[in-house]
C-alpha cells in the first residue's frame, strides 16, 4: 500500500491534477511520507519484534528500497516549492501552516535511517551471512553510514521546521510590525504530524549519540507538540460549536442556512445596482444625423 500511495497518487496528481508551479503546495509531498513511514515501521519491527535473521533481512532491504524511492522525491518537491517561494507565491491565510509538511519526509526519513542502521549493526547481516552484500564485513559500514545519513536528513528537516515556524510567526505581524495575531483553521493541524516525526527522529538521535543536548531538545519538542495538539483541539471544538470553522456561523438549522443565503443574495443585488445617469443607452450622433 505504501508503494501504491507513493507512486500511484504522485502519478495521478502530476498527470491529471497538476496545478503548475504557482499552485503547488506542500501537500504534494504527503504520498512519499507513506513509504517513509513503512520503512520506519520496518525498522521498529526488526528491533523490537524479536524476528529471526532470516525474516529481518527482507524487511531491512525493502525498507531501504522504500527510503530510496521516497526521499529523493521529497527533495525534488522541496526544491520545486522553494522555486514557488522565490516566485513570490507563498501560501497565505491558514494554508501557511502547511509549510511544516515539508519537514515531515525528512523527519520520518531520518528516523527510518537511524533505526535501520542500528538494526544492521546489531548483527542481522553477520548472522544471515549470504552473498557479498549481506555479510559480517559490510554490516558495520552500512549501519554507521545509515545513522550518519539519518543525522543529515534531520538537519534538512531542521531547516524546514525553522522555516515554517518563522513563516507562521511572521504572518502574525502587519506591515508596521505590530502583532495582529494568527488565524486559526483546519490547516493548523498540519503542524502536528511533521512536528511529531521530527521530534521522534531527535529522540532517536539522543539515544544513538547518548547526547544530553538532543535528549533535552527532544523533551522540549515533545512538550511543545502536546501544547499545540491541545490548542488545536480546543480551537477546533470551539469552531465546530460556533460553526465558524465550517462556514455555519449563522447556525446549524435549516432556517439559519436560508437566512444566510438570503443575506448573500441581498448583498449581491446591492452590488449589482448602479446609479442611472441616463447615459447608458445613448448613442453618439453621427455627423449629419438628425434626431
Spell out what each predicted region is:
Residues 199-241:
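A generic transmembrane alpha-helix motif of multi-pass inner-membrane proteins
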Residues 22-30, 58-67, 93-101, 146-150, ...:
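Transmembrane alpha-helices of multi-pass eukaryotic membrane proteins
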Residues 37-46, 108-121, 195-209:
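Hydrophobic alpha-helical transmembrane segments in multi-pass integral membrane proteins
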Residues 1-33, 43-67, 86-94:
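Membrane-interface helix-loop-helix junctions at boundaries between adjacent transmembrane segments
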Residues 45, 54, 63, 70, ...:
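Membrane-interfacial loop- and helix-cap regions that link adjacent transmembrane helices
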Residues 21-43, 186-203:
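Intrinsic, low-complexity N-terminal interaction/targeting segments
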Residues 252-291:
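Intrinsically disordered, low-complexity terminal tails of fungal membrane proteins
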Amino acid at each position: 500500500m505504501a508503494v501504491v500511495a507513493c507512486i500511484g497518487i504522485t502519478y495521478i496528481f502530476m498527470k491529471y491534477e497538476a496545478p503548475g508551479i504557482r499552485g503547488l503546495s506542500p501537500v504534494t509531498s504527503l504520498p512519499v511520507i507513506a513509504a517513509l513511514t513503512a520503512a520506519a515501521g520496518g525498522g521498529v519491527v526488526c528491533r523490537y519484534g524479536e524476528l529471526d535473521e532470516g525474516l529481518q533481512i527482507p524487511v531491512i532491504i525493502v525498507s531501504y528500497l522504500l527510503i530510496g524511492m521516497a526521499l529523493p522525491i521529497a527533495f525534488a518537491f522541496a526544491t520545486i516549492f522553494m522555486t514557488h517561494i522565490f516566485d513570490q507565491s507563498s501560501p497565505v491565510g491558514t494554508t501557511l501552516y502547511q509549510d511544516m509538511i515539508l519537514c515531515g519526509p525528512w523527519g520520518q526519513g531520518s528516523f527510518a535511517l537511524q533505526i535501520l542502521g542500528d538494526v544492521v549493526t546489531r548483527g542481522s547481516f553477520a548472522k544471515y551471512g549470504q552473498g557479498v552484500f549481506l555479510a559480517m564485513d559490510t554490516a558495520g559500514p552500512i549501519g554507521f553510514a545509515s545513522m550518519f545519513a539519518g543525522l543529515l536528513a534531520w538537519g534538512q528537516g531542521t531547516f524546514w521546521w525553522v522555516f515554517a515556524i518563522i513563516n507562521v510567526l511572521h504572518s502574525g505581524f502587519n506591515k508596521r510590525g505590530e502583532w495582529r495575531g494568527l488565524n486559526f483553521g483546519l490547516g493548523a493541524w498540519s503542524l502536528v504530524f511533521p512536528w511529531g516525526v521530527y521530534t521522534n527522529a531527535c529522540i532517536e538521535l539522543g539515544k544513538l549519540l547518548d547526547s544530553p543536548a538532543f535528549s533535552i531538545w527532544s523533551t522540549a519538542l515533545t512538550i511543545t507538540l502536546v501544547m499545540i495538539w491541545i490548542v488545536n483541539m480546543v480551537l477546533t471544538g470551539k469552531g465546530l460549536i460556533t460553526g465558524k470553522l465550517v462556514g455555519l456561523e449563522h447556525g446549524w438549522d435549516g432556517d439559519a442556512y436560508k437566512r444566510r443565503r438570503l443575506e448573500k443574495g441581498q448583498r449581491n443585488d446591492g452590488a449589482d445596482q448602479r446609479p442611472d445617469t441616463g447615459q447608458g443607452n445613448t448613442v453618439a450622433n453621427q455627423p449629419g444625423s438628425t434626431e
